[in-house]
Regions:
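Ribokinase/PfkB-type carbohydrate-kinase core domain
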Residues: 1-375, 393
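Catalytic tyrosine of NAD(P)H-dependent dehydrogenase/reductases that use a Tyr as the general acid/base
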Residues: 378
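Conserved single-residue anchors adjacent to enzymatic active/cofactor-binding motifs
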Residues: 381
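Active-site-proximal C-terminal subdomain of hydrolase catalytic domains
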Residues: 388
Length: 394
C-alpha cells in the first residue's frame, strides 16, 4: 500500500434516525416518564433509560456518547423511526470527507460487513482486523434548537444543535489491531490515531497500545502523528492512552466538550482570556508540540509556530461547515463554495482578539456562517479532521 495518509483505528455502522418529535413524545408517554426523572444516565440498561438519557442531553443542549447494555435496545428504539445506515468512526468519516475533494487514504478497520464494503470510498485501501463479519450499530440522535419535546406540563427545547451516540460495539471494545499495520505505515506522511475510547478492559487497552507503538516504528522519521480525542467511557483510560502516546504525537486535537471535560468546568468560548488560560492549563496536562481545538465558533492551533497550521485549519473549518450545512451528500463544488463563505461574526471577533494575545503561539480562524435550520450535527469533528489532514501533506 502506498497511501501517504493513513487513518486508524476503528469503524462502525451508524443508525442515523430521522427525528420526529411526535413519535418521541409518544414514547415518553408510553413509558410514563415524568419531568422529575430527567437526569444524566450512566450505562443505559433499558429503552426507558435511553429515552430519559436523550431528554437529559436535549435539556442541557449537550452532546455525548453513552454505552448501552445491549444492541437490542438500539434495534428496538430505532424501529419507531425512519433511519439511514451510514459509516461511523472518525477515521472512516474523515476518509469519506477527504475523498470528496480528491484525496485518498488507507484505513485500519475493526469491523467488516456488506454495509462497510458498500459505503467505503472506492479509492480507499484498507486492512481489517475482524476475524469474522459483524454489525454492532451505533444509534445517532441529532437535535436542533427547533426540536421541542413536551414532558408532562414542561417543554424541553435544546439551547443549541448537537448529537448523541449510543452503542455497544464489541469490535471497538476489543480494538483488535491487524499485524499488517506495520506495512500500512511504511510510506505514511500523516497517521491519524483515534478510537480507543470504547475499550473497557485495562490490560487489553495496554496490550493494544504496545502493539500500536511497535507498528509505529515503521513510520518514516518525518511522518506526522495526529491524535483525535474522544469521549471515553472510562475516564482513567483516557489518561492511560495519553501517558503512552504523548511522546509520539505531534498534534493533539479535541472539540469543545472534550476541552471542558479536561478543564472541569463550562468555558465561555467567546472570552479570549478565559480560553487562553484554559489552553495553558490543558497544555500542562497534554504537553505536545501543538494542540488543535475545534468548536462551534472557531478552530485554533496552540503551540510553537502555530501559524504553520493555518491552511489545515481553514480546510478543517470548511469541511466541517460543509457537512453541517449539507450532510453526507455534499459535493466538491459545495466544499469550494463553503470555502468562500463569510465567517461567523462572533467567531471572527474572538479570533482577532486571541491571535493578538499570543502571537506566534496561537493561530485561530472563525467558523463560517451557516443559518440553515435543518443541519447535520453528527460527524462534524470527523469532517474537520478530513479537511485538516490533506493540507498537512499536499
Amino acid at each position: 500500500m502506498t497511501k501517504d495518509i493513513v487513518l486508524g483505528l476503528g469503524n462502525n455502522i451508524d443508525y442515523e434516525i430521522e427525528w420526529d418529535s411526535a413519535i418521541f413524545e409518544n414514547l415518553v408517554h408510553e413509558f410514563g416518564i415524568e419531568y422529575s426523572e430527567i437526569h444524566p444516565v450512566g450505562e443505559v440498561q433499558t429503552q426507558r433509560d435511553l429515552i430519559i438519557s436523550i431528554l437529559s442531553y436535549m435539556k442541557e443542549g449537550k452532546g455525548g456518547e453513552c454505552f448501552v447494555r445491549s444492541s437490542q435496545i438500539i434495534e428496538d428504539f430505532s424501529k419507531a423511526f425512519r433511519k439511514k445506515i451510514t459509516l461511523g468512526g472518525t477515521s472512516v468519516r474523515a476518509a469519506i470527507a477527504m475523498s470528496k475533494i480528491g484525496y485518498s487514504s488507507a484505513l485500519h478497520l475493526v469491523t467488516m460487513n456488506d454495509d462497510v464494503r458498500r459505503l467505503l470510498p472506492p479509492d480507499c485501501e484498507y486492512i481489517c482486523s475482524a476475524p469474522e463479519e459483524n454489525s454492532y450499530p451505533h444509534l445517532i440522535i441529532q437535535f436542533t434548537q427547533n426540536h421541542s419535546i413536551r414532558v408532562q406540563d414542561k417543554i424541553i427545547r435544546p439551547k443549541q444543535a448537537n448529537r448523541i451516540i449510543y452503542d455497544n460495539d464489541l469490535d471497538n471494545i476489543l480494538m483488535r489491531l491487524d499485524p499488517r499495520m506495520s506495512q500500512l505505515l511504511l510510506n505514511a506522511k500523516v497517521f491519524l490515531i483515534s478510537g480507543f475510547n470504547a475499550m473497557q478492559d485495562q490490560s487489553l487497552l495496554e496490550d493494544r497500545l504496545e502493539k500500536l507503538l511497535i507498528s509505529m516504528k515503521n513510520l518514516p522519521k518525518d511522518a506526522l502523528v495526529f491524535y483525535e480525542d474522544a469521549c471515553f467511557y472510562n475516564k482513567n483510560f483516557s489518561r492511560i492512552v495519553r501517558d503512552k502516546l504523548l511522546g509520539h504525537i505531534q498534534i493533539f486535537s479535541l472539540n469543545e466538550d472534550e476541552f471542558e471535560g479536561y478543564i472541569g468546568r463550562k468555558i465561555n468560548l467567546l472570552d479570549p482570556l478565559e480560553v487562553l488560560r484554559s489552553l495553558e492549563a490543558l497544555y500542562k496536562l497534554i504537553p505536545v508540540p501543538k494542540i488543535v481545538l475545534h468548536t462551534q465558533y472557531w478552530a485554533l492551533a496552540y503551540g510553537r509556530d502555530a501559524n504553520s497550521l493555518k491552511k489545515a485549519l481553514k480546510g478543517g473549518i470548511t469541511m466541517g461547515g460543509t457537512r453541517y450545512r449539507i450532510g453526507d451528500d455534499f459535493t466538491r463544488q459545495n466544499y469550494f463554495e463553503m470555502e468562500k463563505s463569510a465567517p461567523q461574526k462572533e467567531g471572527a471577533q474572538f479570533s482577532d482578539r486571541i491571535n493578538a494575545m499570543k502571537q506566534g503561539e496561537i493561530c485561530c480562524l472563525p467558523c463560517v456562517e451557516v443559518n440553515d435550520k435543518n443541519v447535520t450535527t453528527i460527524g462534524l469533528g470527523d469532517a474537520f479532521v478530513g479537511g485538516f489532514l490533506p493540507a498537512l501533506v499536499h
